[in-house]
Amino acid sequence: MIACVQMKLRAEDYRTEQSFATRIMGIMERIRREAGEGPLLVVFPEHIGTFCILSNAPERIWSKRTFAQASTALLLHNAGAVLHQMLVHRVSPVRALFLARAQEMERIYLTPFIDAAQKFQAWIVAGSAALRWGQTSRVFNTAPVITPLGHVIYRQHKVNLVEMEQRAGLDLEPAPLNYVSAVRSPFGALGVAICLDAFHGEVRGRLQELGAEILIQPSANNHPWDDWQQEDWLRSSYAAVVKHKEFGLAVNPMLVG
């Protein structure tokens, strides 16, 4: 069975690492119960882990009205570590905040998915998060693939960034096209194209060349689902599978709210 998770963004799911873990494990428990026994692939939406940067933050940060305000307060709360990263790597304050919080944020984000993969014997594409690449100053929108043994066997970085991910927003880095690869699984070869990447023919073409059979498109959208948006979305997974016959199947989970 393949499960596609549409998840509504709720602040209370990120307040602590325990609340995030409870949310993920609850979703996985329900999916396994509905699926019964047998092979299981679960795909979560884009940026599901990015908001883990706020987990375990003091109440004064959570009292802010918007994510932008809370992020600014978090930056000031971590001013010393942020300044250190800015000086060492010569990066923006936003990038420096991701670097300063990288190790804890990745732990909070990935641990529940690893535990869930093992407990429920599932392959999981854990949506995505803004993650540091090793010990470099590079931060990508990254989608991890996890096996039922709890091994993170692959991390796909996003190639084409939307405006809020670029320098004036989250200050993420676009990945080169040659970072795109396919992942072998019992369900067939998985090709992960994070949100906007699935709209781009060069990304889908590379996945085809690498033998991908299932297109995985973790997405996030906080805009109204109006007529234009619905029509425009047909240019991604739908076009790849129905119109162009590039893949046998596509999975497109969405983070909303």
Predicted feature descriptions by range:
Residues 67-191, 246-257:
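Catalytic-core segment of enzymes that process non-peptidic bonds
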Residues 12, 50-54, 133-136, 224-225:
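Short catalytic/ligand-binding loop motif for oxyanion handling, primarily in non-cytosolic enzymes
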Residues 25, 174-182, 188-202, 231-232:
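A Trp-anchored, charged/polar loop motif used as the substrate-binding/catalytic surface
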Residues 2, 26-60, 82-87, 93-101, ...:
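Active-site beta-strand/loop signature of hydrolases that rely on acidic residues for catalysis
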Residues 1-17, 155-157, 188-197, 216:
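Active-site-proximal beta-strand elements of phosphoester/diester hydrolases
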Residues 54-69, 145:
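Aromatic- and acidic-residue-enriched segments that line the glycan-binding/catalytic groove
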Residues 109-125, 195-257:
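CN hydrolase (nitrilase-like) catalytic-core segments centered on the catalytic cysteine
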Residues 16-30, 103-111, 229-240:
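Well-ordered, non-membrane alpha-helical segments in soluble/globular domains
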